[in-house]
């Protein structure tokens, strides 16, 4: 029964289904009919449009945000003997890429009652071996990039560059994990144009999807040609092959060289077609997410749960996730609430179990006891559905049930 005394029929509300319209289906069908289904003209067009959207000169589309983040580290020449700072409260991809390139992961705890890194602890973690910091725009909310850049500027005297790009940057590189934050902005600048390198995710659950995929953008670096960066990323993504399949279609252009024994992480034109259709609808999708967030915010003000501030004068979120924290509940009570929501037909989630609690990172020597603020964020967090397939009636149903269930615990 809702607050108007009306009975609400049980609904089946998924946590984050993809928002696929006939536009996406047509783009995929057109790609299939074209005979060009691997990396080709649609991928190049998506790269151009993403660069324009993010207000940068170039972008590269690859098969995941993880690949994009790793290739950024490789472009910077980061590897064995180097250190990269990562927040302890994030998804594994933020940290695993550091492991992939052979560098040392340095976890920093989040601030108390916040999902952002503790910037004082971040500054303390910087050494002569630190080559990059990976801030995470969790839930689509930009980090405080002014503070991050101020800290790395203050530590320039410790910085020892490994390659020409690091030397040109002249300080620790900021490689933003903006997997959640495509479309967000920081002080009027699009995320994608703020950090030195920014990686986005287009996975099936993200605001804008290509089913699987991601994009990497970067700021202009004085003395470094953007075309050289783009070309190197293309080499990294396709076995080090000097020509992609599209270039080899030119008359007599069969021959190619292998410049390095590198990787295979390119995007295909089928997936890029989905992305092009999504991008054409994206401003409306962002606006709808904002509407839902505002409805949630208004409904939960009196409930006593903690929520994130997605929209301020300083930044605008992409509205990717709606995280809530129910203070003073136990892990067992949190699970009870999630189960009760599921019984009402509403799928919820938790973002995130801190990485020092995961087997892979325990095996690397990390202990959650060293990250108490991350643990405090985790134990009482529940993420509600937030996506553009939700109707107003769905949102009302979620609000009614969440309010009813949480009131049993607060």
Residue ranges and their predicted role:
Residues 1-36, 41, 257-259, 385:
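N-terminal "arm"/small-domain region of PLP-dependent enzymes with the aminotransferase-like
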Residues 28, 32, 72, 398, ...:
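Hydrophobic "lid"/C-terminal helical patch
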Residues 36-83, 97-99, 107, 156-160:
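Phosphate-binding glycine-rich loop
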Residues 44-48, 56-59, 132-136, 141-149, ...:
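PLP-dependent aminotransferase class I/II
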Residues 74, 78-178, 185:
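PLP-dependent aminotransferase-like
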Residues 96-98, 190, 270:
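Hydrophobic/aromatic ligand-binding patch that stacks against planar heteroaromatic rings
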Residues 162-209, 254-258, 306-307:
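Conserved active-site segment immediately N-terminal to the catalytic lysine
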Residues 180, 193-243, 269:
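Active-site PLP attachment segment
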